[in-house]
Amino acid sequence: MRKITLALSAACLLFSLNNAVVARASAPTPLYTGTTAAILAEQAPIHWVSVAQIENSLMGRAPMAVGFDIDDTVLFSSPGFWRGKKTFSPASEEYLKNPEFWEKMNNGWDEFSIPKEVGRALIAMHVKRGDSIYFVTGRSQTKTETVSKTLQGDFAIPSANMNPVIFAGDKAGQNTKTQWLEQKNIKVFYGDSDNDITAARDVGARGIRVLRASNSTYRPLPMAGAFGEEVIVNSEY
């Protein structure tokens, strides 16, 4: 009889422990995890700069040629790219190789693009300095384009400072922007992508990173500051 009692006790104990483990495993993630001052203060070792600091660093220097990438640098152009994907290749990125998409994007769809405030501030600063403004984009070239007109209007660029957009295109294994930065003698180049920064460095120009908005359709988001370059604060919008 005692053996039976002990066996039953052991079985009950095992059942209780098993239920506790199951309950713990199925418990929901806490809704409020909390934080600490140390976590809140944690920052990546990035060389942050402001537009005012960039302007100050150029003080005393003669007017020069400066360049900007377009998409996610001065324009939040995801609406046009999103429409292009849905229209031409909903299940893939093949629309980026479709000339029909680029005809649409370069001839009107930037009317849906939102000018970034950092773009306004930077361009206004360089116009005030008397710099020559170039836009060098990885977009494919089309027979006609209204991007130059859109950018000039959106950012109030005087004709004396404005140059037509350079469509460098995209070629596998090649940074297509490098030759244009060299050819136009661009001294400062702003961009959101890694290849913008490396293109600038390849020609001895100052590459400055603009943050890509977290809701951009262009994924994955790049790691700003990964090359030790300057990164503009609050430049995601």
Curated annotation (Swiss-Prot):
It catalyses: a phosphate monoester + H2O = an alcohol + phosphate. Binds 1 Mg(2+) ion per subunit. Residues 1-25 form the signal peptide. One of its GO terms (cellular component) is outer membrane-bounded periplasmic space. Pfam families: Acid_phosphat_B. Substrate binds at T137, G138, K177. It is found in: Periplasm. Homotetramer. This is Class B acid phosphatase. It comes from Enterobacter sp. (strain 638). The gene is aphA.
